[in-house]
Each structure stands twice: as C-alpha cells, then as structure tokens.
C-alpha cells in the first residue's frame, strides 16, 4: 500500500525554546500564556537532538512577521502560489496537524518523517525542531540510484526484484517557506 505523502506548505509561525528538565519531562503546559496554540493547548514539547524543546506561539501581540517572509508579491515564476491539492494522494495539512506529527516523531514513531525541503541557506536561518533537512534539489537533481538510496535509507521503501515496494514506507510530512514557495512541492513531485 502506497503511503500518502503530506505537505505542510507554510512554515510554522511558532517559536521554540529549550526547556530545562530534570527528573520529570515538561508537560507542555505553561500557566497563563495569553497567545496559545489552541484554546486547550499552550505549548507542545518535543525532543530534538536529545533536548526537550517547547514550541509555543510568540507572546508579543505586537510582533510583526520577519521581513524575510513579509513580501506580498514575488515574481511568478518561480514564486507561484501552489495548489491546495498538489497531486492525487497528497494531503495538505495545517499547523495543528504538523504539531501532531512532530509529537509522533518526538515520541519515537519511526513511521513518520518530517522534512524541511528548503535549501541550506534557509535552514541555517532556522527550522522546526524535530525535522530533518532534505533540500528540494536533492531529489529533483540526483541520479536514479541516489534517489533510490534516499527512498530506502530515509523513507522506509524496500527494493524488490525490479520494483520498489512502498508497503512499509513512512508517512512523509514536507514543508518549505509558504504558499509562494515551490521547494516542498518540488520534493513531492520528484
């Protein structure tokens, strides 16, 4: 059975910080946050590189978006708005679902992989904790053999006699910079 590839085409507008922890793990609840993720969820704690990271929304209600993401008009192509349904079998998800997948990865679910599809210069500026980086050009510009290695080593695909077997493939969640960004869609289409 072919697994559905999921795409979160907008970078989470959340902040994160390393929380201190001792014998007990952070509960994901911080008393009195005014800007919550949902009415019931103030923060989401995940493991990233051996540390607990608390993801929460920026508490400054006067905060403005980072200028790197503030342009409302970009030349198309290449910065064209992506369709809501990228391809058959591909589901576009929102930020809450992205957080659920990050929690699954954090709790040790090896069947889910959250991928930052952006190029290295974007990742260096910041990424979502708990993700791995597979830049969009890695799949679109590589040889068939290299792509097969990625499918096997990262995505859980197995090689049969002459076909690839997707029976145990992981659920992939890909993201990039937003609606105008084609990096995750390029990875998905590859």
Label the model's feature ranges:
Residues 8-10, 19-20:
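Cleavable N-terminal signal peptides
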Residues 104-155, 162-168:
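Mid-length scaffold segments of soluble, non-membrane domains
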Residues 15-17:
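N-terminal signal peptide c-region/cleavage motif recognized by signal peptidases
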Residues 155-190:
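Catalytic cysteine-centered active loop of the rhodanese-like fold, especially the PTP/DSP P-loop
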Residues 1-6:
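Bacterial N-terminal signal peptides that target proteins for export
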Residues 21-125:
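Flexible, polar/low-complexity N-terminal or interdomain linker segments that lie immediately upstream
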Residues 90-94, 139-140, 144, 183:
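Phosphate/oxyanion-binding active-site loops and adjacent basic polyanion-contact surfaces
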